[in-house]
Amino acid sequence: MRTVLYTGIHQKNNGIIAWEYNWENKLFSILFEKSEVQNITYLCKSTDAPYLFAAGEYDGQGMIAVYRIISEGELQFLTSYIYKKGTFSHLQSSKDGRLLFASCYGTGEVLIFSVVAELPKLEMVKSFMFEGSGPNVKRQESSHPHSVYLSPEERLAIVSDLGADRLYMLSIEQKSKTVKFEFEWKATPGCGPRHIAFHPDGKWCYLLTELSSEIYVFTYEESWKNIQKISALPESFVGENLAADILVSKDGKYLYASNRGCNNCLLYTSPSPR
């Protein structure tokens, strides 16, 4: 079995590197590099379709590149989209690869694209511009949508706005794939929402806040409700920290949260509070 991993290099003149993992000797080896898009900020793969999306830069402008994953993990460049206002901080694809959500941290904007791989074409079909600020004058002078995540059944997209201390809920109509704004949730001032992780059972959602290093637990099956808040730091830690990422294991048994400053990865068991 061949295991291929794609990584993005966040520096000029570098793009995507494909690695092969050898299960026998436990080593990685470089297969190839792709440079259609450079200074990578995020990579995203569609779950049920063979597409890899890469956010980065080209000639000093923001760019999204679309690749088809073909045999043996090779990448075929399909198309791209140039965004002159800035660069993207996060990408999220629908499972079938037909919709792509992109957040632009610097401009306060979230773009939604229709992916037509047969043409190939990446067409922007909707945009949301957010406003707001928070008490942290260095990091929250304006809206900064850091990420967009889709719920497991893909009826809901959640935008984490680090600058405005908000979560924005977008509903997705399944047949037409149209997206509309539903409501917002106000977080604790100064916490800085960063990333979202959904439990695979479709009942629970977890928010990681960058500035306060906390984990919020929500129920959302019937209504949106915050039911718990815990620290993402060990009790013994003293110092500055910026929380980084949060993930739920595929079986739903474990929740992972990483930190920069404390420089660790925390493991929580039984993340679903049942």
What is each model feature region?
Residues H10, E57-D59, Y105, V115, ...:
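Short loop/turn segments immediately following the C-termini of beta-strands
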Residues E20-N25, R68-G73, S114-K121, S171-K177, ...:
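Short loop/turn segments immediately following beta-strands, especially the blade-tip
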Residues S29-K34, F77-Y81, K126, G134-K138, ...:
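A short beta-strand motif characteristic of beta-propeller blades
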Residues K34-S93:
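Blade-loop segments of beta-propeller domains
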Residues V37-T47, K84-K95, E131-P152, A187-W204, ...:
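Beta-rich, blade/repeat-based domains predominating
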Residues I158-E210:
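Loop-centered beta-sheet repeat module
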Residues Y268-R274:
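Conserved small/polar residues in nucleotide/adenosyl-binding loops
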